[in-house]
Amino acid sequence: MLGNFRFDDMVEKLSRRVAGRTSRRGAIGRLGTVLAGAALVPLLPVDRRGRVSRANAAGPAEGVDPRAKWQPQDNDIQACDYWRHCSIDGNICDCSGGSLTNCPPGTKLATASWVASCYNPTDGQSYLIAYRDCCGYNVSGRCPCLNTEGELPVYRPEFANDIIWCFGAEDDAMTYHCTISPIVGKAS
C-alpha cells in the first residue's frame, strides 16, 4: 500500500509539472501531428529489390546463377517451360485455340499487361514479354502454368502476375480465359 502511495505522488507531481509547462493546444497539436504522420507511413513507396538476396539466403551459393533452376526450352510452345512463359501465371492460349500472340476466337484482349524479361536459349538473348489476358469465357483449364521467374509483389503491379488483368477488356468481358505472351522487343 505504501508503494502505491509513492507512485501516485510521483505521477501526480510529474503530470502537474507537465501541465504547468505546456499548453493543451500545443500538446494536442503535437499528438495530432504524430498520429497523422504514423497513419501516412504505409503510403510511402517501397522498393525491396535490394532485399531479394537476403530473402533467398538458403538459395544458390555465391557465383552460381540464381536462375539456374529455370531451364527454358524452345520446342514445345504449349509447355510451361517454353522460354516465353518464364513469368506466366494462368493458362496458355495456344492450348485453347489461340496462339502466342492472338486470343482464341470469341475472347477479348485485355488492354493492360504485365511484363517480364525471358531468356531465349536458341539465340542466347533476353526478350521483353508483355503478357496479356484474354477474357470473356470461363477459364479453359488447359495448359495451366505458374511460373514466377522475375515476378515482383503486387505493390509493383507491372511486374506482378497474380492480378487478373481483364478489367480493361472490351464489352465488360471480365472473366479470365487464358494468357498470350507476345514479344515487345529485346531486353538490354
Swiss-Prot record:
GO terms for cellular component: outer membrane-bounded periplasmic space. Disulfide bonds join 80-145, 86-118, 93-178, 95-143, 103-134, 135-166. Residues 1-57 form the signal peptide. The modification Tryptophylquinone is found at residue 114. It catalyses: 2 oxidized [amicyanin] + methylamine + H2O = 2 reduced [amicyanin] + formaldehyde + NH4(+) + 2 H(+). Its EC number is 1.4.9.1. Pathway: One-carbon metabolism; methylamine degradation; formaldehyde from methylamine: step 1/1. GO terms for molecular function: aliphatic amine dehydrogenase activity; methylamine dehydrogenase (amicyanin) activity. Keywords: Disulfide bond, Electron transport, Oxidoreductase, Periplasm, Signal, Transport, TTQ. Methylamine dehydrogenase carries out the oxidation of methylamine. Electrons are passed from methylamine dehydrogenase to amicyanin. This is Methylamine dehydrogenase light chain. It comes from Paracoccus versutus.
